[in-house]
Amino acid sequence: VAEVGQKQEVQLQQLDAKSAKGAKFREVKQWQVQQQIPAGNDSKKSKCKCKCQCRVGLRRNLQSCCVFGVGWRDKLVGDMKTKQELLTTEIQHIDIKQHNVVPLVDAMASMAYSSRDLARAASIYEMMLRDTECGVILCLAGSLISAGLQKVIVDLVRNNMVDAIVSTGANIVDQDFFEALGYRHYVAGEEYKYGAGDAELRELMIDRIYDTFIDEEELRVCDDTTKQITDSLEPRAYSSREFIQEMGKWLKDNKRTPEHGEHDSIVLACYEKDVPIFCPAFSDCSAGFGLVAHQHERRGKAVVSIDSAKDFYEITQLKIANPTTGLLMIGGGVPKNFAQDIVVAADILGVEASMHKYAIQITVADARDGALSGSTLKEASSWGKVDLTYEQMVFAEATMAFPLIAGYAFHKDAQAARTEKRFAQVLLEPVAV
């Protein structure tokens, strides 16, 4: 025990005794001496040989280590919560069907600033839906599904209030498909919102999205599932729309298995309603990891790949087939520009397409840096993309504004006369130009 104690003391002298971690580590080391546990090698190359395969020392977490002894981690973290304790309170998806916001939004129309803008945007969305010739394109950027907006979008799809979706890959794969597998996003404590504890979260394999937690180990399952889907496909170039349709088919075939259960999903709802989903930057998400692994394993052989130009051509076909269009844009980025540009793309293909008749954007981005996300819809009109008669910018955070706009149109029954456009079927046969 004395020899072990001397080794531990050498390590302790290398720590900052004034730091909280140093003090806690000292306490653990002293506890090891009392338990007659030999000192471990804390080098990066050293690994525990127990089932957890964690790195010795503080470098990798999990439950116990054969070098430090069962219970060492609980002793080390002290007041720090375990992974199970942190991933407890689930993010809840708001249900617009349960909240009639019409009186509230109507009252906001008589106010000023963003309240009035939001009320006007809600009225434009209502008009967009009552125009049964209008093809409604929903654009999604930012981390929306993890924030509790999944059910809003699912309800819009199921009630014919959205005819096509353009999104970032994260919303569709890392968040929606992830939850369709039976996993969840969790509420983070206020102390974590601004970065306190991020190092500990990394040790626990918990990823943070501002005030929301996601289990990295579960994300790896999502990555692997997309690889399984990729491996099952005929090797060729796919549009992201085609690939996501295969994901929807996979959910349809597997959703009732015990490991997946019954869960809402945008991918599944769109598959069932033939609502196409486009992710122009599709590799920038969990699907990208699956595609990379697939192509790495098949070096020198035919592989599955994603063709973003095919995406652009397909969504332009929708504009040609359905000339009257409206945009409901949450955030900006690639989805916003991609959807706006189909007017110009149709013109390049020799079709005189009208500008988007309706356009709404919810954003907190600033127009003054010249970036796309904050560029106004009036600016887009100078490019020949958006008509100015029915357009509205709403400078507000999406989790507050989007449910109000969507809920307003839903409870006004604006979708009553709409029928399924099933745009995914249109893409089976390219439109003649």
Language model regions located:
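Short, low-complexity, charge-dense intrinsically disordered segments
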Residues: 2-3, 15-27, 41-44, 49-53, ...
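Glycine-rich anion-binding loop/nest that anchors nucleotide
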Residues: 136-145, 165, 278-282, 300-372
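Glycine-rich phosphate/diphosphate-binding loops that line cofactor/substrate pockets in enzymes
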Residues: 122-135, 269-271, 317-324
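A generic, well-ordered mixed alpha/beta core segment in the N-terminal half of proteins
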Residues: 153-221
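Ligand-binding beta-strand-loop-alpha-helix segment within the catalytic cores
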Residues: 197-287
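C-terminal functional extensions of proteins
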Residues: 82, 86, 324, 348-433
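N-terminal glycine-rich anion-binding loop in soluble enzyme alpha/beta folds
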Residues: 80-122, 128
